[in-house]
Amino acid sequence: MKNGFLKKALFVLVGFILVSWTKPLPEVFLIGDSIAGHYRPYLEKYISNVARLNWKRDDGQAEKNLDVPTGSNGGDSRMVLEYLKHKMKDQDFKPEYLLLNCGLHDIKHDPETDKIQIPEEDYKRNLEEIVRITGNRNIKLVWVETTWVVDSVHNPKQKLFYRYEKDVIRYNTIADEICRKYGIPSIDLHDFSKKQGIEQFIDHVHYKEPTRALQAAYIAGFLERILNEK
């Protein structure tokens, strides 16, 4: 009886020690546009065995108007930078990885003036500053390219602002150059999403559920490789 109790106690103790020694999963913090908000639930599930996904939180506002960045929608690069500056004041904000995208809101054109929301040089400066402040906190950046725009689909359906694929390509190029400069991994969600076909759009720029799941799986595959390389 006594020996049985001791064996059980020893088993419990060993289990407790093993749990205590288990290294916690790294945290991946996601900031992106409404595209990221749509694939996020799938991504959280797909990487649950290798990382904990956290994200810019929402009060339910982001889904009310996908074209107006509020709540969990990171918005343009200026908004993302300001948000991160605010987060850096919180000493508890220390994810191992920041999974980041901004671009679709940067390239909005005013239909009357044709003025772009964030000019190229400002976009570059904002990304450079994001790299700097996250590096100071030893947060590893993983970049996600901006998804494609089909001018003939987008602009007839969206009268408040226009977007053009030529800007997507140009701004992705700027981001890619910065990624190469600092050795930041970049996930080509642009070409991957384009391969899914024009029929996967539900409106001017957002995707059907099957494509959201595929985007998440594609990103998850890259993240797993990156996490395994550390």
Whereabouts are the PLM-identified features?
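Residue-level detector of flexible, active-site-proximal loop/helix-junction positions
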Residues: F16, I35, G60-A62, W148, ...
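Helix-centric, low-specificity signal for extended rod-like, repetitive segments
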Residues: M1, F16, V205-K208
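Hydrophobic alpha-helical membrane context
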Residues: V19-S20, K45, Q200, F222
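Conserved SGNH/GDSL esterase-like catalytic core that processes O-acyl groups on lipids
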Residues: K23-R125
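Bacterial Sec-dependent signal peptides at the C-terminal "C-region" and cleavage site
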Residues: A9, L13-P26
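Bacterial N-terminal signal peptides that target proteins for export
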Residues: M1-L10
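Alpha-helical cap/lid subdomain in secreted, periplasmic
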Residues: R78-K230
